[in-house]
């Protein structure tokens, strides 16, 4: 997974958006709910970069540091 600063910023934005949407909908903000929201955004976007950002953000929420290849 490429973790340049711009991509990290986009993933953090996607994660924050997911948390805000859950909070504003009075839904529980759990790891599973955030992952589901990120996957929903991935499916809804037509933008290839957006799909990748949401996929990678969901993977980091799901796996933590195991999602990042060693050596980066």
What is the role of each PLM region?
Residues 1, 67-72:
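Short acidic DE-rich linear segments
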Residues 32-33, 71:
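Short sequence/structural elements of tandem HEAT/ARM alpha-solenoid repeats
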Residues 33-66:
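Short, charge-rich amphipathic interface segments used for partner binding and complex assembly
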Residues 10, 14, 53-54, 70:
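Generic signature of intrinsically disordered, low-complexity, basic-rich segments
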